Curated annotation (Swiss-Prot):
Belongs to the plant LTP family. B11E subfamily. This is Probable non-specific lipid-transfer protein. It comes from Hordeum vulgare (Barley). The keyword Disulfide bond applies. It comes from the Eukaryota. Aleurone.
Length: 102
């Protein structure tokens, strides 16, 4: 029981961190870079990126729309480790999106 509660708390903490990341990235996104980079659209991918679950169709669609922005997100020193994590790579692969080489 204690182990299940600990896992639930870690998942909640991970989701909270992801939401902070999304809000911060959204605030710092370069609005003048042609295609709109809107990291808040990647919030639907939180469970796939953080927990390794199968990405939803909406997640894959949003990743495709943000594909040109992924290197920008990877290079952000505060959040790049989320975007370049093994689960993020798995998510990209499951969505049929090439992993960027930044």
């Amino acid at each position: 029981m204690a182990m299940a509660m600990g896992m639930a708390m870690r998942k909640e903490a991970a989701v909270a961190v992801m939401m902070v990341m999304v809000v911060t990235l959204a605030a710092g996104a370069d609005a003048g870079a042609g295609a709109a980079c809107e990291p808040a659209q990647l919030a639907v991918c939180a469970s796939a990126i953080l927990g390794g679950t199968k990405p939803s169709g909406e997640c894959c669609g949003n990743l495709r729309a943000q594909q040109g922005c992924l290197c920008q997100y990877v290079k952000d020193p505060n959040y790049g480790h989320y975007v370049s994590s093994p689960h993020a790579r798995d998510t990209l692969n499951l969505c049929g999106i090439p992993v960027p080489h930044c």
